[in-house]
Structures are given as C-alpha cells and as structure tokens.
Design a protein with these regions (language model features):
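Positively charged n-region of N-terminal signal peptides that target proteins for export
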Residues: 1-6, 21
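Hydrophobic helical h-region of N-terminal Sec-dependent signal peptides
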Residues: 6-13
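Lipid interaction determinants
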Residues: 20-181
Length: 181
C-alpha cells in the first residue's frame, strides 16, 4: 500500500511539473506606431459635459452648475484609418442622442444623424499611452487622448478637457472605442 501511495504521489508531481502555460511563448501586442496602423470602426461613443458658472459673492467665487449633458452614439457607419505615415482620416455617419439636464427646467433630449469628415496627423506616445490628433479638416478628433485599451482588435480612447469662456467652464469627458476591421 505504501508503494502504491508513493507511485501515486510521484505521478501527481510529474503531472503538475510537466504542465506548461500554452501562452508562455505568445508575445504581447505592444502599443507601437507599427501596431496601431489600421482601419477601425466605432463601436462606442460617449460624451459627458458639465457646464458651470462662477459668480462673485462678497469677494468669494461661487461655482454653480448650469447644466449637464450626456451624449451617446449609435448606429455607426464610420471608418477611421490610422496610416503608417502619421496621418489619419475619419469619415461616415452615426446617430447621436443627447440629453441635457439644466439646473432649472425640463430635461431636453435631442437625436440627430451626424455626418463627419475628418483628416489630419497623429502622434503616438506609446510610453505614456497617449495619442494626439491635429485635424486639418473637421474636428471630430482633436487634441490628446489617453489610450485606455489597445490590443489586436480594440482601441479605446478617453479625453478630458476643460474649456473656459469668461465665467463659464465646460468640462467635457469623451470616450471612444474602435474595433479593428
């Protein structure tokens, strides 16, 4: 019986040590200029906006939220191409539904079909996972975006910007996900 236990124990040890990870030799998909090149379609678009105003009350600046909005894209027929020479093009249409919630009054909902043509240059900073778009035509993609997810099939971007105009501040958070063709 002791020999049987010993053989079973040895068999178990051999079984465990002989198993290997099938993915051990697989190289990860690195964020690089070569790997990001390709044609993509939009899979998701979300834009959140907060509009605040500041007013001076007895020398103290008081912020006041004027309105918030949430915009969600849908029904995408949109091609986005990143070329190896650092240029990009984006064209097509999609439906965008926007819900604006003012500080006072009723919520306003709007749905429209947007047609976009956009082109320009891009610069990839793979070390910091950022991509910057400079548009020469259109303004669908403009500025620096954080790369949240990048793999063989998906590119997800996020941009948070703040626009000041006098006492009004617009905080805009844009998230876009693309699927590689």
């Amino acid at each position: 019986m002791k020999i049987l236990k010993f053989i079973f124990f040895l068999s178990f040890i051999l079984l465990i040590t002989s198993c290997s990870d099938d993915n051990a030799d697989a190289t990860p998909f690195i964020l690089s200029n070569e790997n990001i090149v390709g044609t993509y379609n939009i899979s998701e678009l979300n834009i959140e906006t907060k509009v605040t105003s500041t007013t001076d009350v007895a020398g103290v600046l008081i912020p006041f939220t004027v309105a918030t909005s949430i915009s969600n894209g849908d029904i995408f027929q949109f091609a986005f191409v990143l070329n190896s020479d650092g240029t990009f093009s984006a064209s097509g249409q999609f439906v965008i539904e926007t819900e604006v919630t003012p500080a006072t009054g009723d919520v306003v909902t709007n749905e429209e079909i947007l047609n976009n043509t956009n082109s320009g240059t891009y610069t990839l900073n793979s070390e910091n996972a950022k991509i910057t778009f400079v548009s020469s035509i259109g303004d669908f993609l403009e500025g620096t975006y954080n790369i949240l997810l990048f793999n063989e099939t998906t590119l997800s971007l996020n941009q948070e910007i703040e626009q000041l105009s006098g006492a009004i501040t617009n905080e805009i958070n844009t998230s876009i996900s693309f699927i590689r063709e």
